């Protein structure tokens, strides 16, 4: 079984300064560990809400570490320093707006302010990048919604084959 390389990038001014513990990055690792049977290698970073820092980390995770999947958390709202979607779009060759649409639709079931989210997803080379919200509960809800499409997307961009733990989540792959 192939090892899946996963980048986890937390964008947070306060967590990057050690003001509080980053629970969101840990939540991403926990959920993906439940969903995948493959051996997983996580590359984890916390950076401030600075566009150039986010872009550099995304590029490093995609190009140097050759992550199959890069998941960001934080910086997707309308606040002045929330710039994760812009950094993601800058480094991607293709954007996948359906991921953000589904995550917003899912989150709207729980909170009306989900309409303020600017989550997105895109492809850089052979890496799928997905922007998630900043709260662990919302991370789980959004990953549960979009994960069924992730393994097939990674297949299409020639990433490593993801073995899904079907006891915890179902993925969709069209019959070949």
From Swiss-Prot:
InterPro entries the record matches: MoaB/Mog-like_dom_sf, MoaB/Mog_dom, MoCF_biosynth_CS, MPT_Adenylyltrnsfr/MoaC-Rel
Organism of origin: Helicobacter pylori (strain ATCC 700392 / 26695) (Campylobacter pylori)
Protein's name according to its UniProt entry: Molybdopterin adenylyltransferase
Enzyme class: transferase
Pathway participation: Cofactor biosynthesis; molybdopterin biosynthesis
EC number: 2.7.7.75
Record-stated family: Belongs to the MoaB/Mog family.
Function of the protein: Catalyzes the adenylation of molybdopterin as part of the biosynthesis of the molybdenum-cofactor.
